[in-house]
From Swiss-Prot:
It comes from Staphylococcus aureus (strain MW2). The keyword Cell division applies. Pathway: Cell wall biogenesis; peptidoglycan biosynthesis. This is UDP-N-acetylmuramoyl-L-alanyl-D-glutamate--L-lysine ligase. Carboxylation is probably crucial for Mg(2+) binding and, consequently, for the gamma-phosphate positioning of ATP.
Length: 494
């Protein structure tokens, strides 16, 4: 596409050079800029990428978007704008032909449950023989092909490229985990959502948002916007068991479907039966009551299942068809995942990293604990420490607790575990500044019949260490290796 055409929708301060050049790529990553690319520089929290403009010029890039004029060769066109990332969004959606308009787009937000609900929607679509894509905490997936991702919600250009990739692969729908960071930072500008789903709102990310009010407002942006095409049939799915849904209902202009277990809603779960093999319940709907069975464990997952089913139903699939698909869904990786049922202990990993998430996790497993419940939890570095003692208090619902760091980054691991220990309500706990050693200790003290829960990371494949270096780490593999060494069995898979 000709650059002059691309910039027709952009208000610029000035253009230094010619826009008469062909463009086939937009990037905010200086390492990938080349001839035919537009490089969009920006001022981030830690890096000002304007300093890489000369490097991209050396790589053959002939057009840069900047917020002030740079010292560059005369053959490099500079487009000066006030807000480079907003312009990046406009350019990306224009160049890639507004890809989110070309499929059904589901957006899932909330403190806990985003990954589970988003993954369930994707898996239901696959059971229905529909081409589907997913983007979130567990990476990027088109049908069964997976690649890793860096952020829950990538920056705007990368996100648009992923949606375009899904469209080109024939995806009929795409499900996005929508983070509060992504909403506030404008990473979702230009994305057209068909269905927005809310799980819950509990304390998290106050290091970024400052207050719960600001955090809640960030989440509400998804429901008040849902894109720019107000003529489309769009829907909102809200959890009535969370009081924040009342506010979200007031900010969205679209039709709302509500679900709940404890509070009255249009769609409800009754007569709930739970085990470590899954759940069953009566799904009470405006159209009748249906029996639902699922391999997912825990009462909180019933809420997630309902949210996913309603989202898919809202776009035209019958509930009977969806319920049949739900019975055979694969587990969501790292979410209340039971590792190797042949072991004499119940070894479980989960992503719960807030007090609310941990409470729900313990609620789910405690009825099935045969002997002791051993619970390991970590606190992330450079995060909101005000939530940490409450996490320690909740962890002490278990018989024995292990406090570790989780992605300590530049914080002192001993400080992080000490913050968790401030909330301890009994003395049956121990602190480890090395998470792997904490996991090994959990297995070492476990006896047949015990339940060991490794919380906070799920299947996250790294630890963020000083200097923000990512060091390979897998809770599941470390736990299984220790369990096989003690109890026999194996080998550990990848």
């Amino acid at each position: 596409m000709d650059a002059s055409t691309l910039f027709k929708k952009v208000k610029v301060k000035r253009v230094l050079g010619s826009l008469e050049q062909q463009i086939d790529d937009i990037t905010t990553d200086s390492r990938t800029a080349r001839e035919g690319s537009i490089f969009v520089a920006s001022v981030g929290y830690t890096v000002d990428s304007h300093k890489f403009c000369q490097s991209v010029a050396d790589q053959g890039c002939k057009l840069v978007v900047v917020n002030k004029e740079q010292s560059l060769p005369a053959n490099v066109t500079q487009v000066v704008v006030p807000d480079t990332l907003r312009v990046a969004s406009i350019l990306a959606h224009t160049l890639y032909d507004y890809p989110s308009h070309q499929l059904v787009t589901f957006g899932v937000t909330g403190t806990n449950g985003k990954t589970s609900i988003a993954t369930m929607i994707h898996l239901i679509q696959r059971k229905l023989q529909k081409n589907s894509a997913y983007l979130g905490t567990n990476g990027f997936q088109i049908n069964e092909t997976k690649t890793k991702g860096a952020n829950t919600t990538p920056e705007t250009v990368s996100l648009t490229k992923k949606i375009k990739e899904a469209v080109d692969a024939g995806a009929e729908s795409m499900t996005l985990e929508v983070s509060s960071h992504g909403l506030v930072l404008g990473r979702l500008r230009g994305v057209e959502f068909d269905v927005a789903i809310f799980s819950n709102l509990t304390q998290d990310h106050l290091d970024f948002h400052g207050t719960m009010e600001a955090y809640g407002h960030a989440k509400s942006l998804l429901f008040s916007q849902l894109g720019e095409d107000l003529s489309k049939e769009k829907y909102v799915v809200l959890n009535n068991d969370d009081s924040f849904s009342e506010y979200l209902r007031t900010v969205t202009p679209y039709e709302v479907f509500s679900y709940g277990i404890d509070e009255e809603a249009q769609f409800m779960a009754k007569n709930i039966q739970e085990s470590l093999q899954g759940v069953s319940f009566d799904f009470v709907t405006p159209f009748g009551t249906y029996s639902v069975k699922s391999p997912y464990v825990g009462k909180f997952n019933i809420s997630n299942i309902m949210a996913a089913m309603i989202a898919v139903w809202s776009k035209g699939t019958s509930l009977e068809t969806i319920i049949k698909a739900v019975e055979n869904l694969e587990p969501v990786e790292g979410r209340l995942e039971v590792l190797d049922p042949s072991l004499p202990i119940d070894l479980i990993i989960d992503y719960a990293h807030t007090a609310d998430g941990m409470n729900k996790l313990i609620d789910a497993v405690q009825p099935f604990v045969k002997q002791k419940l051993i619970f390991l939890v970590g606190m992330a570095g450079e995060r909101d420490l005000t939530k940490t003692p409450e996490m320690g208090r909740v962890a002490c619902r278990a018989d024995y607790v292990i406090f570790t760091p989780d992605n300590p980054a530049n914080d002192d691991p001993k400080m992080l575990t000490a913050e968790l220990a401030k909330g301890a309500t009994h003395q049956n706990y121990i602190e480890f500044d090395d998470r792997a050693e904490g996991i090994k200790h959990a297995i070492d003290i476990a006896e047949p019949g015990d339940t060991v829960v490794l919380a906070s990371k799920g299947r996250e494949p790294y630890q963020i260490m000083p200097g923000h270096i990512k060091v390979p780490h897998r809770d599941d593999l470390i736990g299984l290796e220790a369990a096989y060494k003690k109890f026999g069995g194996g080998p550990v898979g990848q």
